[in-house]
Amino acid sequence: MTKSKSILTTSFFAFLILIGFAFKSEVEDQSEWKTLFNGKDLTGWVPKIHHHESGDNYANTFRVVDGLLEVNYDDYGAFEDRYGHLFYEKPYSSFQLSWEYRFTDQWLEDAASYTYRNSGIMFHSQAPETILKEQDWPISVEFQLYAEEKEGVPRPTGNMCSPGTDVVFEGKIDPRHCINSSAPTFKWDQWVKADLIVYEDSIVHHLVNGDTVLTYSLPQIGGGVANRFDPAIKVDGTPLKSGYIALQSEGQGIVFKNIKIREL
């Protein structure tokens, strides 16, 4: 075999090996995804609603309808600040969470005005069983979900809010409870795909329809907003390296689908 043929043969086999590794990597990446919502029932999920004990799904707030996980208030009278969260049963540390959502036209008028077309995904949260009956918000970080409130007025989705927590944004702890993303504004009945990428207590990325719209770092316990919590849980300055994921209910109807996660 000539030298040139040897080089070509070696290059060809190297190319095949690279293709093989790429294919293997793609398959492995796909196999890493775990579905969190089975489309049939709330297996693996635990509700915690303000004024109620952990595990009490008051008035069937969280339900499955036509394969979608729905936040619904059909069986409510007055809202009475029943801010709720549906927790997945397992905590996560470094992960990519992916889901799709859209709002419904249901909103309880006695809920706070800011809850209109507003929901969220909490992460790095305290465990649901540690949330006191009269504690309003879990100590956690929130990927806030918004839709248009007034036509033509920007209201980006994918923001960050911080009940009982702090984050570092643009090099310093940001004193604001919520930090706006660069995402567009969506109509309330549009399906939107969102992704949350978290590396323990280091970097957090918010993605909307595949675009990174917000990045911040060093999530930690601190700040205000959460009330009537167990002081033993809220130790300010504690890095949030892991925690629970939860879907929010705060007076606005919303539906979720294709909720899945992979650990990083």
Show which residues each predicted segment covers.
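Carbohydrate-interacting regions of secretory-pathway proteins
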Residues: 23-264
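Bacterial Sec-dependent N-terminal signal peptides
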Residues: 1-29
